[in-house]
Amino acid sequence: MMEQKTSLSSGAMLNAYPDSIGGTLQNIIGLLQRPEMSDAFRDFYILPSIFNTDLDRGFSVIDYSLNENYAGQEDLDALHHMGITLKFDLILNHASVLSPQFQDLLSKGEASPYKDFFINWNKFWEGHGAMTPEGYIQPDDELIRQMFFRKPGLPILMVRMPDGSEVPYWNTFYQEIRYPELNPLDLVRT
């Protein structure tokens, strides 16, 4: 039988956004290295992450590489050498419209292997509301009356598929897709 190892921290934990306290993880580390801060914190919790994101202070993930505007590998190494454990949210349930997965959905539509990564609004609410002239289901009032929405209106993003149809997707962060402008000459070229 394998021995299970657990580690439970008993020291103080610093919580901060990566762009706070000077704007970068390097600046936060500089603060932690000051003599009066030495050994003050055992853990550092970055809210929510230091990944490449484009909205909502880090919850709209483009990809899971380090956002070099906030942190580099040398910063992570410095925390390790200081004996400070880094903690962060691993955000798997929010993806940016700029993520490779969403871009694949835009280019391949229903043929995208990532189509089920995103919630098709109409499939989700099918049988529980009425279709609007705009092409999305307006859920029955009793189903959404108690729901919290971050902004007025329904969180819907109409996504243009490769065949020209528009499909509504759940859009928690109220993102927008910036489609390239059409040149009328492109429509007549073969």
Model-derived segments and their meaning:
Residues E3-R189:
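Acidic/aromatic-lined carbohydrate-recognition and catalytic surfaces
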